[in-house]
Amino acid sequence: MKTIICICIALLIGAPVAAGEEFVDDFRSDELEGRLAERGEWQFQNGIASCVADPDLYKQFKNHGPILKWPREFNDLAIEFEMKAIDCQRVVFTLNGDGHIFRVTLADERPDAPAGKSKVPTRLIAWATKSSKQNKGDTIKPERMPDLPAVNGRWVRVQLNVKGRRATLTIGDFETEITHAALGRDKNMVMLTFAHGELSVRKFRMTSSREADHQSDP
């Protein structure tokens, strides 16, 4: 009996902590369970999702451009993908839950921008509580965060690692760390959208887990 108990304890001690769920989108098919492509004519070829913004659809959807969505429930997250924006006015990467939670916006704020100057600046926004017309969230502007002209026309790797109320964001050679209560909220959607121009995406990979909120984090 003691031998059996010892073996069970050894197995429990040696067992790895449950890994997060991994989701890979290789963009080789128009349809994939766990991914939605909306508000535009998305093309999926050779492992790349791409779309050219349609001005008429942009107006139809009340100034919202083509979007890719990956719905899944999670708290912590490690996500990475590569994107190539060509003459876009803005590219927006958002984590949603009960409303918006965390957003990364790259914008072209030049007066002579191909699609016109973006009214929305390059920035991060975090919502500690449910977003609304009254709750615009907290704006974060890390130093040296690249804008769209800095990455226009080339493939750029984007990574976001969220653990509790802390996150590390990487865009190309740029990296910043964020600590905010918003990051600890329950999440249920990853979204990538853009306005004007053309956006291509490849090598999308996400590992997520349903760990409880890390109350001990500052």
Regions from the PLM with identified roles:
Residues 19-39, 213-218:
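Extracellular carbohydrate-recognition regions
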Residues 27, 79-81, 153-163, 167-171:
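Short tryptophan-centered beta-strand motifs in secreted/extracellular beta-sheet-rich domains
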Residues 31-60:
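Extracellular glycan-recognition surfaces and repeat-rich motifs
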Residues 57-132:
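Secretory/extracellular carbohydrate-interaction modules
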Residues 65-71, 93, 144-150, 190-191:
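Beta-strand-rich interaction surfaces with strong enrichment in secreted/lumenal proteins
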Residues 133-157:
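Short, aromatic/His-centered strand-loop micro-motif at the edge of beta-sheets
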Residues 171-191:
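Short, solvent-exposed beta-strand-to-loop segments that form ligand-recognition rims
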Residues 185-218:
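Ligand-recognition surfaces built from glycine- and aromatic
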